[in-house]
């Protein structure tokens, strides 16, 4: 797939990679420890929710350490589960939405040094699986019936299928009439959300590599996300809608050609892979001025993402920012995935995203989550949300390169002879 979205921007400056050759990373930035990385994200959390920094640190640790618990809850209530969400105000807690009326008592999960409340709400009219199945079954039919192709996604807070439609279509059809028709068609609860545009972000993203487009012959900049490996060699990934022939821009604006391996841009993927002649380390830029790089110590599967999860991204146009996950199981509008997109993308709330952030890394602490693909904008250019491809969908045989973690050494038992 070679979709440039809206008009891509010509290269204005050469500014270094998110995932860079080892030499460039070592000279350009300080490597954070995992604790430093989490503290940086906690600063954003504290500012957003008005809590002390130590409380923000506890909550972010609890958010990540509670994933195994919510996965177990999802398995336990597999036939009733409509969604799992994280609430940050007025207090930090986990909310589980179930179908049926049988109540479930509140529980507590020990995570991050906190006893996190788990609250169960009942009465949802469809399970997560039923909503996703409805998106897959009726997406093409609904797209064909509307002047502008809508997008679809699951809101795990409410258990609803959120249909994001063009504002002009809602005005012409009527909000209530459209909502009723979609609910009757899909047989699951539907909520409409009207926007002006959902599409790919411009190919001028989270950090710079440059190349010439085969479509128009112009020179463009694009982004890289994380360093990846197949076990024998390492490469960098970026968005599939970038030029194939790319060069890394290093210190002094020195260009180092990257070797194109392949691209995958259909349905659930938007990724291409390049190899570099220089050695690569599992680091990525995570601050706006590119003075700090983080190691990658782990990844997190798309299916474990919960509405309300607090995540961060870095884009060349917008720098570093953090916000909440909104929709999981999201299918972007139009033919942005070499045809219709599958409901496998994840959206994150705005307003900090702009044309130019495509391909940038999405993460929390030192955990890699995915690569930014596109966004939705209001008429005034404000970002409603961006959406990303999970690291689950990297090319077959490739995975995110991780920094080895020290193995705790247990001292020998004292000799009591």
Task: Name every feature range the model reports, one short phrase each.
Residues 107-113, 119-236, 247-265:
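Non-catalytic extracellular/periplasmic "stalk"
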Residues 1-27:
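Secretory targeting and sorting signals
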Residues 193-417:
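Terminal interaction modules at protein C-ends
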Residues 38-40:
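General marker for long, soluble alpha-helical cores
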Residues 32-36, 47-50, 57-61, 66-68, ...:
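Short glycine/threonine-rich beta-strand-turn micro-motifs
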Residues 15-19, 97, 163, 357, ...:
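Primarily hydrophobic membrane-targeting regions of prokaryotic envelope proteins
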